[in-house]
C-alpha cells in the first residue's frame, strides 16, 4: 500500500496484473483529463497556438517587468550606492557574551546594539587580473586609495580564496566606522593608476584609472560584454561557495542533463528521434513560465540564484516520466486501432466504441483511460509534498522554491492533457501522411505509375479510416511543411508583436509592479556573502583589536567591490545614459519624424540592445531554421511489431481451428449460432482516371436503340473528346477502323468496366481470329464487379476479364510462435488438404522454426568492351574498394529503399557480367533494382573512366531471373529461408500414418539420390513448387518466379525417435508491396497473414515475414506428401478428393498381381521377409 503513494518513476516496473475495477477517484478524475484532451485533440492547432501565445506573452512580460527593467528606478539597482552593497552583507558580533568568537546576527539586531559596541564596516576592493605576469597594470597600493581626511580608516590584511590563483586578482581590505561607509564609497569610485601613461583621446589627454565596476556606464550592452559579466559573476559565486556545495550543484546539473538524454532515448524508442522530446521540453518550459508568472504576481520573492540552484533537482526528481508514459500508451493504442479497424473493415463489422471516434481520438482517449489516473495521482502526490515544503517555514529559499515548483507542476498537469496531447495528435497525423507517402514512393520505385500508386496508398488510408474521420492536414506531403511554416511564422509574429509593443506600454502603469518588484527579494539582488571566505584575515585583526580594548564589536562584511582599468571620460558618469533625459530625448527625437512607425522602429532597436532579448531572438531564428530542415525529414516511428503475437497460443483454439479445416470431418461441431458476416462495400465501378476528373459528372451514354451516327459525326465527337457519349457499337466501330487504339480504351472512355466490355467485343469480331474468338464477348470469363482501376497501368494491359481461381486455406500453422492460416490458390485437389495435415503434425511438435539466411534481390547486366584488357580492368575496378564505393553511392541515390549490398563479376571473353545484389524494402524490387543498375552503369561509364563500355543488356541472365540456375542455388536470390520442425514419433504414426525410419529412408532415396540421378539443380524436394505456386497466386507474387523460388532441399533425420525435418530455400523471391499485391483480393490474403504493404517501422520486415511463412508452408507440404508416399496413400487420396471412381479390375484371367504403386513397405516388414531373399542377397546384407 505504501508503494502506491510513490510516483511511478520510483516504483519501478509494475508486475503485470489483471484489469481491476476503477476506483472511486479514478472514475471522478479520469473523465476530467479525457475532457481536456478531447478538446485539445479536436482542435490541436488552435491549442498549440493559444499555448504558444500565452507562453510568449509570459516570458516577454517577465523579461520586461522583472528581470531587465530599463527605467530609472531599476537602473539604480546594482550601482555604486551604499544601500545596494548593504543588501548582500553579513553582520558579525564578537564580545564577552560570545566568548570573543564571531557570531552571525540579523540586520535588525544592529539597531538594538546601542553605544556599548563599536559598529564597523569591512570593505574589500578587488582589482581583477592585476597579479598576472602578462598584465600591463598593477593594483594600487593601500595608500594610493583616495581617503577623505575626516574618515578614520584602517587597512587590513587581505584574504585569498582558492580561486585567486586562477583569477590573478589583487585584494585590498579596509575597516571603518559603519556611518562613514557611504562617504568612503563615493570617494573610492575612482582610484589612480600610477603605471598608466597619459595619451590623447577625443575627450582630451587622459590616462586609465581604476573605475569601480558598479559605477561604470554601459553605453552599449553587447553580447560579449554580457557574457563577460556573467562569467565574472559566476566566478564570484564560486569564490563565496563551499566546495561541497559546488560538488553537489555540479552533480545536480550532470543528473539534469542525463535526464534530458534519457528523455530523448525513451522517445527515440517510440519512433521520434527529436521532436517529441523537444515538445516535451517546451511543455515543461511553458509550465515553468506560467508558474513563475503566478508566483511573482503573488509577491513571493524568487531570485535567479535560487532558480539556478533548485531547478536541476526539480528536473531530476520530477523527470519526464508522465510524458513518456502517455506517449507510449497513445502510440500503442494507435497501432491497436489500425489493426482492429483493418480487421473490422475486412469482416464488415464495426466496433460501436470506435465507430464514432477517429484513430487519433480513440488512441488518446484509450491511453488516458488506461494511464490517466496514475498520472493524476503522481501529480497530486508531488504537489502535496511541495505544498508541505512551502508551508514548512524553513528559510534559505526552500519555501519560495517549493511554492514555485508546486505551481509549475500544476500547469504541467494542465499542459500535459492539452498542449502535449495536441502535439501527439499532430504527430499521429504526420505519421499517417508519412505512411501514405512512403507507400506511394515505394510503389513508384517498383515501377508502378504515380496514379495507381496514389490510389493504392489512398485505399490503405481509407482502410484505416472510419467514416467522418477527416484528415488534419490532408493527404499531400506538402501539407506538413505548410503547417509547420505557418506555425513558425505565427510564433515569430507573436514575439515581434510583443517586443514592438514594449515602447508603447505606459511606464506609469508599472509603478505598482516596480513597488512589488522591489519586494521580490532581488531578482537581481546580490547574493549574501560568506564573511569568512571574503575577509577572514581582516576579521582576525579586528577581533584581536576588540579583545585588547575589551569592547564588543559589530562588523558588517560587505560584498566585494570590483574595479576595472578604463578611461574615466568613457566609463565614469553621474547617472546611466539609458536613464539620462538628454539621451532619451535625442533618441526619440531621431525617430520622431516617422510617427508611430518611427517610435516602433526605435523601440525595437532599443530593445535589441538588451543582450538577453537579442539572445532569445537568435535562439528563435535557430529553431526556425531547424524546424524548416525537419519539414522534409519526418522521423519514422514504431512502438511494437504488429507481427509479434499478443498472447500465447491457446491449444484448444488451435484444435478447433484444425478440426474446422480438417478434410476428415464432414460436418462442423454444433455450437453457438454465428450470424453471417456482411460483405464489405466494394469500391464503386466504374472508376475514373485522374485525368478525367470531369467524369464524376459523366454524360450518360447514348441509348443503344438509336441509329448509329455517321463516321464524320463520330470522328468529330472523337476530336472533341466526347467518346463517352457514344454507344458501345459506335466505339467498337471507331476502334475497328483504327481511330481508337485498343490500349487507350480505358483512358478514352473514363470507364474501366465499359472499356473491358468493348474490348471483348472488338476481339470477338476481329476477322483474323473470329473463327475461334467469336464467343469471347458472351463467354463466361467474368469482367464485372472488379476494381479495374488498380489493374490499369500496373498489372495487366488489354484487359478482357479476370480469372477466378479457388483459394483455400491450410492450417493453422504455428510459425515462430504465431499461428497463421496459409492462403493457397490452386486447382489441384488434395493440395490444401495435404498441407493442412502437415500443419497439424507440425503443430503437435510445437510448431515450425524459421531462420532468414539472406535478403537481397539481384540483377546481372552484361557490358562489353573492345578488348579483353579493358574488360579485365573494369572487373578489377568493380572488385576494388573505390569501385564498390562509387557504384554503391550511385545505386543508392536512385531509391529510398534500394541499398546495394554487393557486386559479383564474371568475365567471358570481352563480355563482363555484373551481379548486383540489393535490399529492396518490402517490394520484390525487380523494377527498383533495374533503375538503380541503369544509373550505376551510367556513373561507371561517365565518372569511372569506362566511357568505351557498351551496355549490352540491363539483364544479362546473370541474375538469374525466372530460370533454373546453379547461381541462384549457390549464392541465393531474394530471401534465403530455412524452416525446421521436430515431429514426435507418436504423431508420425497417428497423424501421418507412417514411421520415422521410413520417412528418413524415403527422403534419402527420393529427394536426395533420385534428384541427383536426374541432374537436378535445387530440386531436392518432393513438391515445393506446388506450395510456392499456390501461395504466390493467392498473395499476388510473380508466378514466373516460382522457377527459382521453388529451389529447395528437404532433409529428414531421426532425432531420438522423433522426426527432424527441415527445408532450405535460398532463392525465395517475394514482396508485399507493388506488383500483384496492390490488387484487392491478393491484398486481402496478405491481410490475413498480417503482412500487407510496407512495415510501419522497419522496411522489409513484412516481405521477410512472408518468406518465413512460405518456407514453413513448404515444410508442411513436404512432410505430408512424403508421409503419403511412404504409407502408399497418394493415389487413394487423389481418387477420393477428385471424386473419381476407382479403376475396376481387369476381366482378363490372370494371376493376382501386386498393383504397381508408390507404396513402400516399412523397414520392419522388409527385415521380416529376409527368408525369401536369395543366399547372395542375405550375404550382402550381413556385410
From Swiss-Prot:
Span list, region Disordered:
1136-1183
Q: Which GO terms describe its molecular function?
A: hydroxymethylglutaryl-CoA reductase (NADPH) activity
Binding of NADP(+): at which residues?
895-897, 922-930, 1138-1139
Q: Which residues cross the membrane?
A: 246-266, 274-294, 300-320, 379-399, 403-423, 483-503
Which residues does the entry place in the Cytoplasmic compartment?
Answer: 1-245, 295-299, 400-402, 504-1183
Functional summary from the UniProt entry: HMG-CoA reductase; part of the first module of ergosterol biosynthesis pathway that includes the early steps of the pathway, conserved across all eukaryotes, and which results in the formation of mevalonate from acetyl-coenzyme A (acetyl-CoA). In this module, the cytosolic acetyl-CoA acetyltransferase catalyzes the formation of acetoacetyl-CoA. The hydroxymethylglutaryl-CoA synthase then condenses acetyl-CoA with acetoacetyl-CoA to form HMG-CoA. The rate-limiting step of the early module is the reduction to mevalonate by the 3-hydroxy-3-methylglutaryl-coenzyme A (HMG-CoA) reductase HMGR.
User: What is this protein called in UniProt?
Assistant: 3-hydroxy-3-methylglutaryl-coenzyme A reductase
Task: Recite the lineage of the species.
Answer: Eukaryota, Fungi, Dikarya, Ascomycota, Pezizomycotina
Q: Which gene encodes it?
A: HMGR
